[in-house]
Amino acid sequence: MRLEGGPATMAHPMTHPESSTQPRQAAVFFILVTVVLDMLSFGIIIPVLPKLVEEFLGGDTAQAAEIYGLMGTSWALMQFVCSPIQGALSDRFGRRPVVLLSNLGLGLDFILMALAPSLAWLFAGRVISGIASSSFSTAGAYIADVTPPDKRAAAFGMMGASFGLGFVLGPAVGGLLGAVDPRWPFWGAAATSLLNACYGFFVLPESLPMEKRAPFRWKRANPAGALMLLRSHHELFGLATANFLMNLAHGVLPSVAVLYLGYRYGWGPSAVGFTLAAVGVCAMIVQGTLVRPITARLGERRTLITGLLCGATGFAIYGLAPTPLIYCLGIPVMAFWGLAGPSAQMFMTRRVSASEQGQLQGAIASLTGIAGLIGPTLFTQTFAAFIGPQADWHLPGAPYLLSTLLLLIGAGIAWRATRAV
């Protein structure tokens, strides 16, 4: 099979698209499907992994929660360490081989987890998953490669919607498979990842031309070196800081949403699940359909700030809502937070060259990993501090209000950083 006039090899280059006035729609579609399938394979195991850990521990729920938390921390740590490496590798060898090998690695890793005879093997599989999942940063670099700068906000919005679609579908499919056998979702995730690798091998073209590639150097590939890129431009550092605060604020949802909704409103797992699914669907609609027209109407800078302020308002509604109805009314407001991420990505990709896009996305992913390490402890401890008997002020919504503060600070930093852009 020939793509762009050449054979479908692991490192086949395509003509760089930034000289054209329109993004390479086919290439964007390919990478968006890849993102959906990646997130689908990731989300499939969510409903069953804690239960499988508990089974290995003989039903000890408390110890299982501790081990599961360590698994999550290990996954985030691997993201922090390995995302810059994969980003630098993609700058050197191209995006295509990194994406395909990561998908292949994920597929084999899920098979390992499906066959895991002990908790140690399951833990090792989770660590490997964190390494292989670092290809998400390469997907962001691919989008930057194949999309002209003035189209990137919409393209990153579609990428965010693809993340959301895969993440909404994944747990639902995993729950159905897990009802039959707790190991079936791992086989489903393996099949999805391996099929994705096959799909990409035949249809995914390379996006980074040979002449725009950069040598691989460890000073670029290690987290500290990758983060130094963010300090190379004042605007870039400010935007990266705002993006970090966005990711940190988002950590309140997986950390305390279930605890908060159960504590304050008496909701069970099904009600919480439907609510979180509604949040994901609304955000997906905004990122998939509204980023382009809103950006065209408001401009890129105002779209970014509007998204951050909507997120801050949504979290404030969540934290102060006296009734479940008021809480649910915050969901559509929160959905417009989805404007901020694509806009921030668009601004940041404009500040670096084509040969640095992988390094940039790796640095962003490393910051996301740091947020993933900090968030669970920060928000659960805040929640405990404001509902415990020692609390001077009983405020269950304190974690959400903390996220509101983080986004307001992020909005101020982003406004200042984009003044000269």
Where are these regions (language model features)?
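Multi-pass alpha-helical transporter architecture, strongest
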Residues: A197-V203, L401-V421
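Conserved MFS/SLC helix-loop-helix module at the cytosolic interface between two early adjacent transmembrane helices
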Residues: F80-L119
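C-terminal transmembrane helical hairpin of 12-TM major facilitator-type secondary transporters
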Residues: R301-A344
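Helix-to-loop junctions at the C-terminal end of transmembrane segments
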Residues: C82-G94, V286-E300
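Juxtamembrane intracellular "pre-TM" segments in multi-pass secondary transporters
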Residues: T15-Q25, P205-A242
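A membrane-interface helix-boundary motif in multi-pass transporters
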Residues: G178-A191, Q381-L406
